[in-house]
């Protein structure tokens, strides 16, 4: 397995994401610049948090036109695993791989804290190592994480079990129905505002994010009939 971490001008969580893949998954991982146009050798593509292009216009609005995004869409259509975290989630909605939009936090303030999430769907490539209904702790760091969609889209998300994570307890940004992360209908594209890559070691206060990366690896191994030996 080989993983790509896309780097846009203004990305700032790319190193954290790269290190999480190396530390937890133990597979080859590369930084891929936003102007690159070939992702064919990668099995999973990760879009990190940050402030791509300074968040001008709105979060992700400029990054969605980066040359690499055409290849990200192609990879998603091919069934490869795509995960967007924070700004990466915003970019995935802007490019149309995920429905809805991320608005300014209801408080109009940047929120940076450890948040509790409830796992709504553990039957995905990204959450299979969690239990359904489990409450986990993952940090957030965003000013525009207020998820919104229209009623028809929300009904589809619920019917198709595309709501993967909800905030548990405090809703830090006013997100519709406490939504913290969603996937596409096919289940190979996930977007979430919290940062699992910042919760992969016990010294990080929480290591609950670790299981997202083990889930991705386990999914790829099963899809490619790869066996491991103790």
From Swiss-Prot:
Keyword set, alphabetical order: ATP-binding, Cytoplasm, Glutamine amidotransferase, Hydrolase, Ligase, Nucleotide-binding, Purine biosynthesis
Pfam families tied to this protein: GATase_5
CDD domains, A to Z: GATase1_FGAR_AT
Positions annotated as active site in the UniProt record: 86, 195, 197
Gene Ontology biological process: 'de novo' IMP biosynthetic process
Subunit structure: Part of the FGAM synthase complex composed of 1 PurL, 1 PurQ and 2 PurS subunits.
Name listed for the protein in its UniProt record: Phosphoribosylformylglycinamidine synthase subunit PurQ
Originating organism: Brevibacillus brevis (strain 47 / JCM 6285 / NBRC 100599)
